């Protein structure tokens, strides 16, 4: 049986690793979290989120104590926002 001390040491190791590598977050559209932003700030997240069609842009936040990630606001799931922007730029695209 694994002792409590071994579990505790493993838990602390995972937290320490997450704090060091917390800027490397992979996209997760379900949670609205896209990419790590440790050291980049809100301007970086706003650009990233707009590339992912977030109507409200984005900000660099700390969704949990061991990770800094871009939080995108109102991601457009059906691409309507993107298509409307294209139609404004290229009126000939209208159906």
From Swiss-Prot:
Signal peptide: 1-22
Keyword set, alphabetical order: Disulfide bond, G-protein coupled receptor impairing toxin, Ion channel impairing toxin, Neurotoxin, Potassium channel impairing toxin, Secreted, Signal, Toxin, Voltage-gated potassium channel impairing toxin, Voltage-gated sodium channel impairing toxin
InterPro entries assigned to the protein according to its UniProt record, in alphabetical order: LCN-type_CS_alpha_beta_dom, Scorpion_toxin-like_sf
Annotated GO CC locations: extracellular region
Disulfides per UniProt: 37-60, 45-70, 49-72
GO molecular function ontology, one term from the record: potassium channel regulator activity
Comment, domains: Has the structural arrangement of an alpha-helix connected to antiparallel beta-sheets by disulfide bonds (CS-alpha/beta).
Role, per record: The homodimer inhibits HMG-CoA reductase (HMGCR) (32% of inhibition produced by 0.6 uM), a glycoprotein involved in the control of cholesterol biosynthesis. The inhibitory effects of bumarsin are seen at much lower concentrations (0.6 uM) than that for statins such as atorvastatin (5 mM) and simvastatin (10 uM). In addition to inhibition of HMG-CoA reductase, this protein lowers cholesterol levels by inducing steroid hormone synthesis via StAR, and by increasing reverse cholesterol transport mediated by the induction of ABCA1 and APOA1. The heterodimer non-edited LVP1 induces lipolysis in rat adipocytes. Induction of lipolysis by LVP1 appears to be mediated through the beta-2 adrenergic receptor pathway (ADRB2). Intracerebroventricular injection is not toxic to mice.
Family, similarity comment: Belongs to the long (3 C-C) scorpion toxin superfamily.
Protein name: Lipolysis-activating peptide 1-beta chain
Species annotation: Buthus occitanus tunetanus (Common European scorpion)
């Amino acid at each position: 049986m694994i002792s409590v001390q071994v579990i505790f040491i493993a838990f602390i190791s995972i937290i320490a690793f997450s704090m060091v590598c917390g800027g490397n977050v992979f996209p997760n559209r379900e949670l609205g979290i896209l990419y790590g932003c440790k050291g980049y700030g809100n301007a970086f997240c706003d650009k990233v989120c707009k590339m992912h069609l977030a109507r409200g842009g984005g900000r660099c936040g700390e969704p949990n104590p061991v990770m800094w990630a871009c939080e995108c606001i109102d991601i457009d799931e059906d691409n309507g926002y993107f298509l409307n922007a294209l139609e404004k730029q290229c009126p000939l695209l209208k159906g």
